[in-house]
Each structure stands twice: as C-alpha cells, then as structure tokens.
C-alpha cells in the first residue's frame, strides 16, 4: 500500500469517528507530515491509536469532541499516547507525549487580561503540545530573531498561519489558551537571544528542527533608533533583492558609521550564537536519544547562511586590511612593515632567500665577554628586526652570527662601521662569507704534483677539480635543494679523486714493470756475453777507418791461433800488435750490449762501393799466445757460414745469444774483383 491509499483509509476512519471535524483533523495531520510510514501505521493501527491521534488534534485545534464519541469510546490520555512523533520514521518504539517535557511559557501576561488570564496561563502550561500555534514552549525565546527558520525568510513565519486559516472557521469556539494572541511591545516580555540557559535551546519542538512558530521582533531585539525606526539592515536587500520592498521592517538604505558598526557587530554576534545553538542542538539528541527530537535533522540551510555571512564579513575585513596595507606601502615606504601583521614576501625577500649571506653578519668579540644571545638581539634590533642570533657554545667563544629579516639592515650596520659595544664588550662586525670560496693556492697545496718526479712522466693534475665549480654554483645559495646538490658534488669529487688515484697508481706500476723488464734483459745479455769467447768485431760503420778494430780481452787459456781479416792484395797492411798495444784503451764498455748493435747499423742497407771496398780491404789480426804478437793472415771469405761454424776459435759447445736478431745483407766479392749483392 502506498501513501495515497493509506491517506484515504485514515481519512475514512476519521470521518467515521468524527464526521464534523474529519477534514480539519486530516488537514492537521497532512500539514504535520509525519511521513508515509506513520500514515500507513494509522491506517492499519488499532482503534485506540486513532482515537489518541484525533484527541490530540482536537486539543491543538481547540475543537470539542462529539458527544457520541465521548460516550461510546473513551479517549486515551495524551500523556500515555503511544503515537510516535517522528519525521524520519527511524524507530517504531512509542514515545510519550511531549506535554511532560514542556517548559514554562515565555510570555507573562499582565493583569489587564482579566481574571481568567492566570487560569488560561495554567491551562496553556499544562496543555503544551507540539503545535505550530503555541511554538513548543521556550523555543521562541531561544530562536534567533533575525535569521529565518530552516532557511526561510522572516515573514515566512506567517505562512503557516495562512495555511491553517481554514482550520479556524468558528472563531467563537477557539480556546483562548491555545489561540495565538497578539501582544504589543509594552504588554510582553521576552528573553534576549543569548539568555537561554538549557542544553536544548530550541526545546523539544519537532517542526523544522526549531520552534513551530516565532513571535514578532520585540523592542529590545529590534533596537529602535532615535527616529523610531529599526536600524537593522535587511539581509535580502544587502544581497541584491528584497521581495517586501518598501514595506520591509528592516532598513534598505545606508546607515551611519556608528549604526553600521553596531549592526555588523550584532550580526556577527547573532551568527555566532546561532552556530553555538545549532551545535548544542546536534549534541542534544545524542544526549537524549529517546526524546521526540532524537531523530530530527538539523537545519542545514540556516547554518549555511550564517556561515556564508561570516565568510562574507571575513572577506570584507581582509579586503579592508589589504587596502590599508596598500595605502601604508604607498605612504609609509620602508616603515610599512611595522604596521602590518606579518611581513609579506616581495622581490627583496626572494632575493634574500636565494642569498642568505646578504641578511647575516659575522661578529668577533673577546673571549671574556659575558653577554648572551638575547643581549645581541636587543642591541641589533635598533637597526632592524632580528631573525636569529647564533653564538657557538664554547669555553672561549669569540665569534657569532646574526641573521636579520631584511638585507637593508645589514647594509646599514656595515655602513656604520666598527666597533659596537654590547654589555661593555667590544664587538666587531664583518660581512658574512660563504664556505664555498676556497682560494686557489690552498687547493694547489692540497693537491699532489707528480709531473716531474713521477717515473712515468705523467701529470696528475687532470681536470677533475670541482671546487671552483661548486664555489661558483653555491656562492649565493643555502637552501635545502642546493645543500643536496653540494653533497652530490662532493661525492662526485671524491669518486673522481679516488678513480684518479687508482689510475695513477696503476699507470705508475705499469711503468715500473716496463723498466724492470728492460733492465733484466740487459743484465741477462751481459751475463751470457761474458761467458762466451772473445771475437774481434770490425767497427767500420762508426769509425770509418779501415784499420780500426775493437779488441776484447780473452782469458789466458786461449789456443793461440789467429783470425785474419781478408782484403785486396794491393791495400793489405800488416798490423803489429806490439806497436798497437795502446789500442786497447779504445775498447768500448758496451760492445756486446744491444745499444752497440743499434749504433753499428748502417744508414742504408745499400752501401756505396767505396765504403764496401774500404771495409773489405781493412785487415786485422789478433794473436793470443805466450808471445802476444799480432801477425798477418791471408784473406778469407766472411760469410754466414764462416762466422757460424767454420770459426776455429769458437768452441763447438757454446753459442752466443743475441738480444736482438737483425738481418744484414752483406756484399760479397766475385772472381773478377767486382762487388756483387
């Protein structure tokens, strides 16, 4: 069954019980709008539940019960009514009537109302129900007077009366204790917006999360001005449009300065009070979960309107502050920062962030000084705002650093000069310098120089120097990112220096190994040469003379035979060993080494005929024996076979190893005396 069919069933049941007032009772139930589930519950509920609902509606509408209904069916008291007043239908457990939760009436009637005024007041206090007419007790006293209920306008409070006008056809039958009576400002007394003292300032009213009806603005809340009109501004007119026009009870025009200031303050106070009440209203159902308002939602629209108003006022306040700051910047110049809440960042601040050294100074002072960092800050605050003072905690402190907010303060202090006296201590001020500036001479002393003393002749000063690069890059920077960059550069520099040292060491070891190989080869060749027998070697390529010979001394156990060099018969010469005894002084020490072989090489393998003739006509004889004489010998053929195997002076078991093997194309003589290759 849907809500429409349930409504028809409920109306038919009410019409069967009370046909005279069925339309009014049904209209009240529809206006209250308890939900579809509650309507279905009334349609299928017992007769006692329907009688209790009808009796409660008659009390609210001030209707007399029909005589047959009073005699036939007893009504259930309102205090024991199981009817659940819930807008969200979140629970099905019955709740007692809100009459037991009713508060005292906020209105105190005067004695001019007649003798029945006290009795009517007592009846009204005893029959306080959830009605759009009586407002649910003290809710009207706590409602904000100038803010709409549930997001509606202020004049929308009377729309409910217009909707319920058809319910009050008979004016004579209305109970004066339940009817809404009009009171002027002199006949009523109502508490102010902030005079509510309960945890639930809205009471226990269920309609729209607040009071069912709100009274008109009272005199003490309207704040009448001297001309008799209220100076409260119209919020709708301030936003651009007011539907009431000239008949609006609030001011649409401009206000005086004092009135506008008071109005703004009052609006802010009302907004804050309303937000506090809405917060307590949200906390109230949590504290009393079984109250009729335990499941009622709060009014988000009114809260959002108050928040929007507060945000708008805050934005206007910020705009005013910006305008004042701009005026101070234009008029005051450098002194504007003294009147502002906090200094704003400009180009100078960004430059000082990139170059923190421009905002710092370096202090030097005697070691026996007794001043503290606070004393230094108080002294230099005369020149400008001080950001930080750093003095190292040492036994003999002699230096410190002061950081200012503006770099102009540093320029002013440096321009003043030295000395400064802080607590009778002489303090010298110097400009701050970055650590990255390393002089070249210290860097050269720290770096090794192996260009001349190295055995390999290598220059160790390779281009792996990152100090100068890092000094240039980090000269005007001290931020976190640049500190990380500095660390990376240092790590790269250390890695490069380590690699450089490894390369130099490996190259130096390679050079030493090459030198060891050369020296060992030379020593081995010399040792093998001294073990062999002596052989006369004709050094015709270097000396150029036919008779020049190189003689190597032989041991005394030689055989005494001679070896003669052959030449032409016309140019043969006898060399006397006795006359040439002093020729032994011309013996070279490195005759058998590889250097001598290199020097004996001709300039060209194709030698001229004159040099070849001079070489083959030169004769030399060596006689080794007891007499020690050199004799002449016949010519012999010098060839590879004669030197290698036909030499009678060489022992057959010894070979002379040569450190180098070279091929020499030697010329030979023909039978006719011509030289052939």
UniProtKB/Swiss-Prot annotation:
Zinc fingers, C3H1-type class: 228-255
Matches recorded under Gene3D superfamilies: 3.30.1370.210, 3.30.70.330
Ranges of compositional bias, category Polar residues: 98-113, 535-562
One Gene Ontology term of the molecular function aspect: zinc ion binding
Keyword Acetylation: no
Matching InterPro entries: AtC3H46-like_PABC-like, AtC3H46-like_RRM, Nucleotide-bd_a/b_plait_sf, RBD_domain_sf, RRM_dom, Znf_CCCH
Alphabetical list of CDD domains matching this protein: RRM_AtC3H46_like
Record-annotated RRM domain positions: 359-435
SMART domains documented for this protein: RRM (SM00360), ZnF_C3H1 (SM00356)
Record field: compositional bias (Basic and acidic residues): 589-601
UniProt keyword list: Coiled coil, DNA-binding, Metal-binding, RNA-binding, Zinc, Zinc-finger
Keyword Zinc-finger: yes
Name assigned to this protein: Zinc finger CCCH domain-containing protein 23
């Amino acid at each position: 069954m849907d809500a429409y069919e349930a409504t028809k069933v409920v109306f038919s049941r009410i019409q069967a019980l009370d046909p005279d007032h069925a339309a009014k009772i049904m209209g009240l139930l529809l206006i209250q709008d308890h939900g579809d589930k509650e309507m279905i519950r009334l349609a299928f509920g017992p007769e006692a539940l329907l009688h209790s609902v009808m009796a409660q509606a008659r009390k609210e509408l001030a209707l007399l019960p029909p005589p047959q209904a009073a005699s036939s069916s007893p009504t259930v008291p309102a205090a024991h009514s199981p009817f659940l007043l819930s807008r969200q239908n979140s629970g099905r457990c019955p709740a007692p009537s809100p009459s037991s939760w009713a508060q005292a009436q906020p209105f105190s009637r005067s004695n001019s109302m007649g003798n029945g005024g006290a009795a009517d007041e007592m009846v009204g206090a005893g029959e306080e129900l959830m009605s759009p007419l009586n407002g649910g007790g003290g809710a009207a006293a706590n409602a904000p007077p100038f803010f709409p209920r549930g997001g509606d306008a202020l004049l929308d409070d009377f729309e409910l009366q217009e909707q319920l006008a058809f319910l009050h056809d008979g004016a004579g039958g209305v109970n004066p204790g339940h009817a809404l009576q009009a009171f002027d400002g002199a006949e009523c007394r109502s508490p102010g917006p902030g005079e509510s003292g309960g945890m639930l300032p809205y009471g226990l009213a269920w309609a729209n999360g607040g009071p069912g009806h709100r009274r008109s603005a009272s005199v003490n809340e309207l704040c009448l001005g001297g001309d008799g009109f209220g100076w409260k501004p119209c919020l709708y007119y301030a936003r651009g449009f007011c539907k009431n026009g000239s008949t609006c009870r609030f001011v649409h025009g401009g206000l005086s300065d004092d009135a506008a200031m008071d109005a703004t303050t009052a609006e802010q106070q009302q907004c804050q009070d309303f937000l506090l009440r809405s917060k307590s209203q949200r906390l109230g159902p949590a504290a009393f979960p079984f109250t009729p308002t335990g499941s009622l939602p709060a009014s988000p629209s009114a809260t959002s309107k108050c928040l929007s108003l507060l945000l708008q006022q805050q934005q206007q306040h910020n705009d005013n502050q910006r305008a004042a700051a701009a005026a101070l910047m234009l008029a005051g110049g450098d002194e504007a920062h003294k009147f502002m809440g906090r200094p704003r960042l400009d180009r100078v601040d960004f430059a000082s962030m990139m170059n923190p050294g421009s905002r710092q100074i370096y202090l030097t002072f005697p070691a026996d000084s007794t001043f503290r960092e606070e004393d230094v800050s108080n002294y230099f605050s005369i020149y400008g705002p001080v950001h930080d003072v750093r003095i190292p905690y040492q036994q003999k402190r002699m230096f410190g650093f002061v950081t200012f907010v503006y770099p102009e303060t540093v320029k002013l202090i440096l321009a003043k000069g030295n000395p400064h006296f802080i607590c009778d201590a002489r303090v010298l001020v110097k400009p701050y310098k970055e650590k990255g500036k390393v002089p070249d001479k210290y860097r050269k002393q720290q770096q090794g120089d192996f260009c001349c003393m190295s055995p390999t002749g290598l220059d160790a000063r390779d281009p792996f120097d990152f100090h100068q690069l890092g000094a240039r890059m980090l000269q005007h920077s001290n931020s976190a990112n640049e500190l990380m960059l500095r660390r990376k550069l240092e790590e790269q520099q250390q890695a490069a220096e380590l690699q450089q040292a490894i390369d130099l060491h490996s190259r130096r070891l390679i050079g030493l190994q090459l030198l060891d190989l050369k020296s060992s080869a030379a020593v081995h060749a010399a040792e093998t040469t001294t073990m062999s027998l002596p052989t006369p070697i004709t050094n015709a390529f270097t000396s150029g003379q036919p008779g020049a010979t190189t003689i190597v001394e032989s041991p005394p156990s030689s055989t005494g035979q001679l070896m003669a060099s052959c030449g032409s018969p016309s140019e043969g010469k006898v060399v006397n060993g006795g006359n040439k005894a002093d020729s032994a002084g011309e013996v070279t020490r490195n005759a058998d080494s590889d250097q001598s072989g290199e020097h004996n090489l001709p300039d060209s393998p194709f030698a001229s005929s004159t040099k070849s003739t001079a070489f083959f006509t030169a004769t030399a004889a060596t006689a080794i024996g007891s007499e020690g004489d050199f004799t002449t010998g016949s010519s012999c053929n010098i060839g590879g076979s004669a030197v290698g195997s036909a030499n009678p002076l060489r022992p057959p078991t010894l070979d002379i190893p040569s450190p180098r093997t070279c091929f020499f194309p030697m010329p030979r003589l023909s039978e006719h005396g011509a030289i052939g290759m």
